[in-house]
């Protein structure tokens, strides 16, 4: 659900602290803190933060593969760290994640030719992301069972602007907020289910929220 329309670094908190003792720390924090959509590289990892501007969402890049995001009564946002391009890699993540309402923790990314948005969902809040989706089977991976689904978005935001595209989902039946995800197992299962894969664009360990509140601190490798 990503449309990178506004690439502005949130530096408003710098004003007023430049003359204060220890102000360099405040400036550095402000450089890391994002409140509007942006992509880039941080400590060797690709990061992506997209928000539709609703509610309050603050994203911070930490050391290495770490990131933190806090949201209150948000509209819709997706944020995280990973790689660009993605690949059939094994992803490890750990930390804390909680959502009071509609939210997902997933290995998330995009493919092109065809344009595909995909989720390997590790945990979610009050809303089951498979609601209304077409069930295509299951895959056993990394000590758990995932249900496979397909949905289609029409005239929706994408990495190529407003477009119509398919979404592929693997949704873990037992929630977790740390572990290893062997993405190749999911890509192979999707192909076996008849889903066409494209060329990798970015891949991140993502926190997504929709009309909810919550917080996450995660480290990706």
From Swiss-Prot:
Keywords of this entry: Carbohydrate metabolism, Glycosidase, Hydrolase, Polysaccharide degradation, Secreted, Signal, Xylan degradation
Subcellular location: Secreted
SUPFAM superfamilies per UniProt: Concanavalin A-like lectins/glucanases
Catalytic activity, reaction form: Endohydrolysis of (1->4)-beta-D-xylosidic linkages in xylans
Gene Ontology molecular function terms on file: endo-1,4-beta-xylanase activity
Active site: 117 (nucleophile), 208 (proton donor)
InterPro entries to which the protein is assigned, alphabetical: ConA-like_dom_sf (IPR013320), GH11/12 (IPR013319), GH11_AS_1 (IPR018208), GH11_AS_2 (IPR033119), GH11_dom (IPR033123), Glyco_hydro_11 (IPR001137)
GH11 domain boundaries: 33-221
Transmembrane segments: none
Principal cellular location given in the protein's record: secreted
Signal peptide bounds: 1-19
This protein's record includes keyword Secreted: yes
UniProt-listed Enzyme Commission number(s): 3.2.1.8
GO CC terms in record: extracellular region
GO biological process: xylan catabolic process
The keyword Ribosomal protein is annotated on this UniProt entry: no
Pathway: Glycan degradation; xylan degradation
Role this protein plays: Endo-1,4-beta-xylanase involved in the hydrolysis of xylan, a major structural heterogeneous polysaccharide found in plant biomass representing the second most abundant polysaccharide in the biosphere, after cellulose.
Record-stated family: Belongs to the glycosyl hydrolase 11 (cellulase G) family.
PANTHER family on file: ENDO-1,4-BETA-XYLANASE A-RELATED
Protein name, entry field: Probable endo-1,4-beta-xylanase B
Organism: Neosartorya fischeri (strain ATCC 1020 / DSM 3700 / CBS 544.65 / FGSC A1164 / JCM 1740 / NRRL 181 / WB 181) (Aspergillus fischerianus)
